[in-house]
Amino acid sequence: MKKHAGEYGEKIRWVNYRTGVNSIRFKIEAFKNTSRVCIDIVNKDEGVREVFFEQFEEFKTLLSNSMNPLDWIKEYRIDSGVYITRIFTEINGPSINQESDWGDIYRFFEKNLIALHEFWEISQDVFQDLEN
């Protein structure tokens, strides 16, 4: 992913992507036979999560044009027992445990992270305004 820089040539931290919005995190996950690119809304306040979720819904067409299909889950329980809101796309089949599948997983992550980055460059200001 090093070959993909930001709009002004800046280095992008793909694994620890800085959204600039405390309540929003971009996350990648790889399990035995499933890999995901996620948008997590992590604010402890359910009402705040709802407002951010509704704003993402306003951008649903734009987001879905590049990251498809997307699952939209208002209450997603993470391993720690905390509830977050999650929007994600996933690929089933390629296994992180099979080296022969790594290329498919990499291409899935690359395509969707670039699409997410391009979406974020367009919409980030709206979400930053919501947080303030």
PLM feature spans:
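Ampiphathic alpha-helical segments that act as solvent-exposed interaction surfaces
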Residues: 93-131
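UBC/E2-like fold recognition across ubiquitin and ubiquitin-like conjugation systems
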Residues: 1-5, 127, 132
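Polyanion-binding interface signature
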Residues: 1-92
